[in-house]
Amino acid sequence: VTGTSVIPILPDGRIVLIRRRDNGLWALPGGMVDWGEDVPTTIQRELMEETGLELVKIRRLVGVYSAPDRDPRIHSICVVAEAEVTGEMEIQDTLEASEIQAFHPNSLPTEPMSHDHARQLQDYLNDLTILA
């Protein structure tokens, strides 16, 4: 199963995270690619559903993460991209996200994150492109 994670960057440089309702952990917005969708369309849709933000452009591919244990629910392959975003933060899908917040890169939450999102974020901050 293919999914996406988005590293949304606001015009002021802050990174937007959501708190997942299912496990209470901070996470990158994202989700599964729907039948008939390409990855950029999924990124745009999931970004709007989970944050209310609009995709301006996908800046770069951060990586492809495929470890069988990266998602506790299923074996999924996650395509991670940095995205320039605009708009007002507002959760659209309240079944998936309970909170939304923007963080400066030097003040990201230190608590554990959902799935392998801490690694994805660290790879991004280290300016890496990963195939894992």
Label each residue range with its predicted role:
Residues 24-26, 95-132:
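Nudix hydrolase/Nudix homology domain
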Residues 10-53:
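Conserved Nudix-box catalytic region and its N-terminal flanking loop in Nudix hydrolases
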